Amino acid sequence: YLDSTYLKTAAQAGLSVDENILVTKGFIQEAIEERFKLIMIRPDMVCLAKKMITEANSTLQIGTVIDFPQGESSLEEKLAEAIQAIQDGADDLDFVCNYEAFKNGNVDLVKEEILTCTQLGLANKKVVKWIIEIAALNDKQIIQLSSLIKNVIVSNFEQELFPKVFVKSSTGFYKTENNLPNGATIPAIT
């Protein structure tokens, strides 16, 4: 199976809003025609994707990012964005974990975020992914945050739901010092 991702805003792509919508439509159409499993798009494009997929009678799934790319919004803001994405037709919710709060020792906030957002996603039969942004963390923090997510899931959900929850390494948007790889590239992980 292939997934495909387009997460650029119009400004990031150097396009007008209308031009970026056309690019997104082309991206969605290609995924439909090539029978990809899932597309990953920004939340404001989920309705457009759902409409195109439904009209094409396609099985293409829609993933979207929540609190992207920094992950520093409040729990209430994360939940509101996720609820809207679910209502708009998203199948996969990729939450950016508040890794800065974790680094600053606010583990309880991160636990609550992981538990509450995962509950929302799983209750709505969605795949839930937690992006931890490894370029912003040292090796010890990567292990600790990944373990924290695992422990929250294992302690609070039935085993049959475990395959619906993932940890992802990177948004691909993290700005590193000296232009070093940000975790979303082969050189960063080899």
Language model region names:
Residues 1-34, 38, 44-190:
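Alpha/beta enzyme core
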